[in-house]
Regions:
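Inter-helical turn/loop segments and adjacent helix faces that build the functional surface
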Residues: 59, 108, 160-171, 230-243, ...
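Acidic/serine-rich, low-complexity amphipathic helices located in mid- to C-terminal regulatory regions
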Residues: 148-163
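Core register positions within helices of long alpha-helical scaffolds
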Residues: 51, 58, 100, 107, ...
Length: 381
């Protein structure tokens, strides 16, 4: 396919997904589809609604805004409570969808969105923390920091503190990124480990460093986008902190680029083991890289020369994994369904573990980031 054909196909693909989805039954949430359980407020839908709202902002097409509002309104009540969401679960994943409430509040001015924003914020006020001050990823994972959690919570946290709390928590957010750099960055590769256990008690944690054993692509992707999204919401008056996160972002992109597959432009599921049996070129993390870089270049956080790396990743992913079925339906493959650390399934962070998780099509953890990258590609035209 030509680049123009790919962009057209992606537009059709998004329309196909929203035409076949609702808040009760989003076809892109494969975990929910497989479980057969009713849908809940969750980060996976949050990724897709963020992408739809970004499409609205870029194209002006009202159908994306209308779909997003209807989806969110299924959960958000007039008093600001959110159906199926419990702040006391202390799960950072559940904060992600909250970013979209700011957008809807700005557009529609409905106070229920403002109240729901405070509902989400109430979780972060009492979210358990490590001794150094980082949010625990979940209450059920004590003392643990995962890269995923930076994307799930920090952009919301930074936006709330900047808008409504006189920037009181902004330096706290910055310090959490610096703690992650101190503990989770590998000096040799520049990559960041998926998880860190401050207590050093988990079976997956290195007894000296507390880190998990490997560099999972999607976790790195979440982390890169988190830095871009936090910078976007951060006041430049915080001179040292703003430039500190920008420097961390630039260095991370430089380091990650070294692991980009030369032929396809994609990245491997476990980043530093290319071609190892069981490893594969993975869609979601590659798309997150493309989005982070394209957005970072557009907003001036990254040098323009990096955009070529992102475009190669974007088109490489589409060439390899985006296709049209004989019945006319569209499909995006190569998406790791899920990966975590600990829990009842003994997720030990090994190569074998990351290679064992299901690879699926049309899941929002891959679709959402690719559509976000697509909106950046449109903006470059």
């Amino acid at each position: 396919m030509t680049h123009e054909e790919i962009l057209t196909l992606l537009g059709d693909y998004v329309d196909y997904l929203i035409a076949n989805s609702s808040a009760e039954a989003p076809m892109w949430n494969i975990e929910k589809v497989r479980s057969g359980k009713p849908n809940k407020w969750n980060y996976i839908d949050g990724c897709m609604i963020t992408a739809c709202l970004s499409l609205y902002k870029t194209t002006g097409d009202e159908k994306y805004l209308s779909f997003s509002r209807d989806f969110i309104d299924f959960f958000v009540q007039e008093d600001g409570s959110i159906r199926t969401y419990d702040p006391k679960e202390y799960n950072l994943d559940n904060v992600n969808q909250g970013k979209n409430l700011f957008t809807l509040y700005d557009i529609f001015g409905d106070e229920k969105y403002r109240r729901a924003i405070d509902t989400i914020r109430s979780q972060l006020l009492t979210q358990p923390r490590t001794k150094e001050g980082n949010f625990w990823h979940k209450d059920i994972y004590p003392w643990q920091v995962w890269l995923d959690g930076t994307y799930m919570a920090q952009p919301f946290y930074m936006e709330y503190e900047t808008r409504y709390n006189k920037m009181q928590g902004c330096i706290d957010s910055y310090k959490q990124f610096m703690n992650i750099k101190k503990h989770m960055r590998d000096e040799k590769t520049g990559l960041y480990y998926h998880g860190y256990d401050e207590s050093r008690q988990m079976y997956w944690a290195d007894p000296v460093t507390g880190c998990s054993p490997n560099f999972w692509l999607r976790a790195m992707g979440w982390f890169m986008v988190a830095m871009v999204d936090v910078l976007e919401r951060m006041d430049e008056q915080l001179y040292n902190e703003y430039r500190g996160i920008m420097a961390q972002l630039r260095q991370t992109i430089e380091d990650v680029h070294k692991f980009q597959d030369e032929e396809t432009g994609m990245f491997w599921q476990v980043m530093d083991h290319p071609g190892v049996e069981g490893n594969y070129l993975e869609t979601s993390g590659t798309a997150l890289f493309a989005y982070a870089v394209l957005k970072g270049v557009r907003l001036g956080y990254l040098p323009k020369r990096m955009a070529a790396w992102a475009e190669k990743a974007f088109y490489g992913t589409c060439d390899r994994y985006l296709s049209k079925n004989p019945d006319g339906s569209l499909q995006l493959d190569g998406i790791c369904l899920v990966a975590g650390l600990g829990g009842k399934d003994h997720r030990d962070g090994s190569l074998a573990y990351y290679f064992s998780e299901p690879v699926v099509c049309n899941d929002a953890k891959g679709v959402g980031p690719l559509v976000l990258a697509y909106t950046e590609m449109i903006a470059r035209k």
